[in-house]
Each structure stands twice: as structure tokens, then as C-alpha cells.
Regions:
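Cell wall/extracellular polymer interaction/catalysis modules
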Residues: 1-161, 186-191, 208-243
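Soluble periplasmic/extracytoplasmic beta-strand elements of cell-envelope proteins
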Residues: 132, 166, 204-206
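Short beta-strands and strand-coil junctions in structured, solvent-facing domains, enriched
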Residues: 142, 173-175, 193
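Short beta-strand-centered aromatic/proline hotspots
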Residues: 163-172
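Short Gly/Pro-enriched loop/turn and capping motifs at secondary-structure junctions
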Residues: 172-174, 212-213
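Short, solvent-exposed secondary-structure boundary/capping segments
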Residues: 173-183
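Intrinsically disordered, low-complexity linker and terminal regions at domain boundaries
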Residues: 190-204
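Short, solvent-exposed mixed-charge patches
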Residues: 242-253
Length: 253
């Protein structure tokens, strides 16, 4: 029964998954109709050198997103030092750990080493600052021409508002409808890591497969708006009374 499910709310979180193409232009579109949960992950030392203690000390905050690009400065990622400290703690604990706990600790050490290497080499989207969506693993990076790739452009529609966004990460196969904290709070100022902006299946995610820029990089907010407007025009344009949101770059120098 539903009462036995871990999360009854997400038992039914998808109204539509539609693959279509506009006949006049051939522009492919993946349309997801769902709710919106909040994802709060990501970091980028090049654009944001410091993060709050609640993030630095969090055991749950994920420092990376699937959409990433090579670091462009020598500024360290703010989460690098906490992860290095975590790795040192795991190694110290391993020295005196009973045999039954060593396997799990070695897995934690391996994971921490991979994260540290990523933080040294790459930058990522930041949920609090960048508007992006999360697509289920079973949908993204598949062989279908309608399957989105990381960095593809998307437009999120809630009511009469249209929000430009990027496909920034992949989530569980069983979960549809996730947006970054920046996107969520623009839709509903009361949204937070534990409070979704939209609970009903009234959010349209228009994803444009194959639209990602040739070279990954930090979001260019002017280009984000312009490109999403172009893509919307390729599927017939916006209806009367609808407006495309213009994001402000909160991390601009």
C-alpha cells in the first residue's frame, strides 16, 4: 500500500513524458510534465570562493553536478579542504577499525579520493546561484535522439512564467521533476532544500536535445535567455501573455 512506501508523495510524480518535433523546423523537444522538488548541490571555486559553514560541514551536500567544465583559475574549491579533512579522518579511523568495518571505510576513502580529484580539476553549477534542472538517469544521456545531454537548454513553465534553465544533473530513475534552489525560489520564494516550490503536476519542462554549447563552461546568463528564446521560436514561439524570465548573474565580478 502507499502507506508502506518511503515517500508517498513521489509515488506518482509524472504526468507526461513526450518526445515530439516541430514539423516546420524539425526542432526536437522532450516535454516532461511533473512537480518540482529542490536539489541543493554544486560548487565552483572560480566563481564562489567561500561557502557557508552549514554547507562546508554538511555530510549530505554534494559538491559536484554532472554538468561540469575544467577549472579556469587557480582558486581552490571551497569544499576541497573539508573533503581532504574527511579523507584524513577516514584513513585514521581505518588504522584501528575492526575488520567488519574496514570494507565500508575503504569505500568511503575511495569515494573521497575521487571527489577530491574532481574538485581540483573541475568547476560545477551551484544550486543556490544557477538555474538548472535534474533529469532522471533513465532519460538523460541515452542513445535516443530525444535524450537530453548535460548542458542542453531547457525552459521551465509554471503558470504564465517561462524560466530559462540548463540540464545540469541526473537523478534517480524513479524520480522526475527537480530544480535547483535558484530556480525553485524564483518560482516560489518559500521554497528551500526541504520545501518544494510546486507539489502538483503543473510544471512543464521543455528540454531541447542537442542544444548544448560545444564547449562546457559557467552559465552565460544573457546567452541563456537569448538561446532559449531562439529555441522557443523554433517550436512556434511564446503565446500571448507569456514572458521569458531574465536571470541576473549573482556571481558577476
Amino acid at each position: 500500500s502507499l502507506l508502506k512506501l518511503l515517500d508517498r508523495h513521489n509515488y506518482y510524480d509524472t504526468e507526461t513524458i513526450l518526445e515530439t518535433a516541430y514539423p516546420d523546423t524539425g526542432r526536437k523537444l522532450l516535454w516532461l510534465q511533473s512537480e518540482m522538488d529542490v536539489v541543493s548541490d554544486g560548487s565552483d571555486g572560480d566563481r564562489l570562493a567561500a561557502m557557508p559553514d552549514k554547507i562546508l560541514k554538511s555530510s549530505f551536500y554534494q559538491p559536484s553536478t554532472s554538468y561540469r567544465w575544467k577549472k579556469r583559475t587557480d582558486k581552490p574549491n571551497p569544499l576541497l579542504n573539508p573533503w581532504q579533512q574527511r579523507l584524513a579522518s577516514y584513513k585514521k579511523t581505518l588504522e584501528k577499525a575492526p575488520a567488519a568495518e574496514k570494507t565500508a571505510l575503504r569505500r568511503k576513502i575511495d569515494h573521497a579520493e575521487r571527489v577530491i580529484e574532481e574538485l581540483k580539476r573541475y568547476s560545477f553549477l551551484i544550486s543556490e546561484y544557477d538555474p538548472f534542472i535534474v533529469v532522471p538517469l533513465g532519460v538523460v544521456n541515452q542513445s535516443s535522439p530525444f535524450s537530453p545531454q548535460f548542458g542542453d537548454y531547457a525552459v521551465v513553465i509554471v503558470g504564465d512564467k517561462l524560466y530559462p534553465a540548463l540540464v545540469g544533473d541526473a537523478g534517480p530513475r524513479y524520480k522526475t521533476g527537480e530544480g535547483s534552489l535558484r530556480l525553485s525560489r524564483e518560482i516560489n520564494p518559500k521554497a528551500g532544500p526541504y520545501s518544494r516550490p510546486v507539489s502538483d503536476l503543473k510544471v512543464s519542462y521543455l528540454i531541447f536535445p542537442g542544444s548544448a554549447e560545444p564547449e562546457a563552461g559557467p552559465p552565460d546568463y544573457e546567452k541563456l535567455t537569448d538561446r532559449c528564446r531562439e529555441l522557443l521560436n523554433e517550436i512556434g514561439g511564446m503565446g500571448k501573455g507569456f514572458k521569458l524570465h531574465q536571470w541576473e548573474d549573482l556571481l558577476a565580478p
